[in-house]
A protein has these predicted regions:
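Conserved flavin/dinucleotide-binding core of flavoenzymes
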Residues: 3-4, 107-109, 319-322, 336-464
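Hydrophobic anchor at the start of a short beta-strand
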Residues: 13, 34-36, 272, 394-397
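Conserved Rossmann-like nucleotide-cofactor binding loop
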Residues: 21, 44, 279
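Glycine-rich FAD pyrophosphate-binding loop
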Residues: 30-54
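Dinucleotide-binding Rossmann-like beta1-alpha1 core, especially the glycine-rich loop
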Residues: 55-143
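Active-site/ligand-binding neighborhood in enzyme catalytic cores
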Residues: 114, 131-251, 255-258
Length: 464
């Protein structure tokens, strides 16, 4: 919906940003019986979640899955009546790591790529004998006594050795977040590993004690219409007129209530939830609290690009038996990773065809996205062809640029967020949510959006 003017009544809550966190917050607030409006600067809701569908192809331009271990997304699907449409990844669910030009499977019995059983370590062809010996010695490595944040590279190198940094932490742990392994915070992104060391003195020993076993359904699920189906269903579940698109907020002010100026008109609300990137939050808050604005704008962001390519099956010689691969920086390629989409999910390509996605840029290679569209497409296409034995040109290509859409939880991020929360207490009724602060990934964004909605609802109800 677009609007040239907004109702001049005072709403309970105004939400700025219709990404998944903002939509989840709106859904929760509507369920509580509060009046809500969501202002979205672009022409559609969903943020980085978007799915393109044509001629039997289904292409997620952003995230393509929901992590089952974090139940917020699956729970929301259940509430929306689409849980029965959730589909697991296809078998086999093998993921690969590129080393010296060859793809090596991550062995069964691994957690986040780390072999936690002796069998997994022995079976792995990814590591040298020296690397395996160093990783096996993790159980003998003393725990850290200093209680302060450190980078993923520092933590993994200290406990598992350099090969684990280069071939697991860099492409997998940092790659998930499009970041630089030397800068990203282990405590902010993988607190479970930090807690394992603290409690047991050994990550491997702690994970073995938990008896981590893969779910028969796999770690991830999606929907037949891609992750965009979740956004479509969630948006439709809100009352007509709740989402106002092409409504870029230009000013936020507070007196007895909050006044929000946007390109769609003026909105007044008792409470405001900012569900936009941290740097946008900062720009909106600068006239109100410049210190808070500085804190928000200090959250670094990376830009990424996704290149999708469609082929006939007979053009690809690689068996594509698995979900895809990641590329360590030591390999010297532009690609960060590749997904074998049609092998990972059912119904993503017409029969006899293959859909692939390649990823470029991120905190590891920030200047890559200075290249033009055709150069990015050609780079991804050529590297995929070399790795997977592809002949001929793709039937089509798509490029999706995500400029400053990947927040980087660098060392010290948790302290910054705590400081932001303290400053927000000076602005009663104003709350922040989304991936820039406490939530990486769809389930966490949904959970944080709904938790923030509950806080906004409590504020409004206490003043009713």
């Amino acid at each position: 919906m677009n609007a040239s003017a907004l109702d001049d009544s005072v709403l309970d809550v105004a939400i700025v940003g219709a990404g998944i966190a903002g939509l989840a917050a709106a859904f929760d607030l509507r369920a509580r019986g509060l009046t809500v409006c969501v202002l979205e600067a672009t022409a559609r809701p969903g943020g980085v979640i978007a799915t393109e569908r044509f001629d039997g192809w289904t292409i997620d331009s952003g995230p393509d899955s929901l992590l089952v271990q974090k139940p917020a997304a699956v729970t929301l699907c259940r509430e929306l009546g689409i849980a029965d449409r959730l589909v697991p990844t296809l078998m086999p669910r093998t993921a690969y790591v590129l080393r010296e030009g060859r793809l090596h499977a991550i062995a069964e019995g691994s957690f986040l790529g780390f072999p936690i059983t002796l069998g997994a370590l022995v079976r792995s062809r990814l590591f040298s004998l020296a690397g395996k010996a160093r990783m096996a010695g993790e159980v003998l490595t003393p725990r850290r006594t200093v209680d302060e944040d450190e980078s993923i590279a520092s933590f993994v190198g200290r406990r598992f050795g350099r090969e684990a940094v280069d071939y697991l932490a860099d492409p997998l742990l940092a790659g998930i977040h499009a970041g630089d392994v030397d800068r990203l915070s282990i405590r902010a992104l993988f607190p479970r590993l930090v807690d394992a060391e603290r409690r047991s003195g050994s990550v491997i020993r702690a994970l073995r004690a938990l008896h981590v076993r893969p779910s028969p359904q796999g770690a991830f699920v999606s929907l037949p219409g891609g992750t965009g189906e979740l956004v479509d269903t969630l948006s439709a579940a809100l009352a007509p007129g709740t989402i106002v698109t092409n409504a870029r907020v230009t000013r936020l002010a507070r007196s007895d209530v909050y006044a929000i100026d946007s390109t769609a008109g003026l909105l007044r609300a008792r409470s405001v939830v900012l569900a936009v990137p941290a740097y946008v939050t900062g720009s909106l808050l600068r006239p109100v609290d410049s210190t808070l604005a500085d804190l928000c704008e200090a959250v670094p962001y990376a830009s990424t690009a996704t290149v999708a390519c469609g082929y006939r099956h007979d053009q690809v010689s690689h068996p594509l038996s698995g979900t895809g691969f990641v590329v360590p920086r030591t390999e010297g390629l532009a690609l960060l990773a590749g997904t074998w989409v049609s092998s990972k999910w059912p119904g993503r390509a017409p029969n006899g065809h293959v859909l692939l996605r390649g990823y470029l840029g991120g905190g590891r290679d920030p200047r890559r996205l200075e290249a033009g569209d055709q150069e990015l497409i050609s780079t991804a296409q050529q590297e995929l062809a070399e790795l997977l034995g592809i002949s001929g040109s793709p039937l089509f290509t798509r490029l999706y640029r995500w400029t400053r859409q990947s927040p980087q939880y660098e060392v010290g991020h948790l302290q910054r967020v705590a400081h932001i929360e303290r400053r927000l207490t000076n602005l009663p009724g104003l709350f922040v949510t989304g991936s820039g602060f406490r939530a990486i990934g769809i389930p966490d964004c949904i959970s944080d959006g709904r938790t923030t909605a509950a806080r906004a609802a409590d504020y409004v109800m206490q003043r009713s």
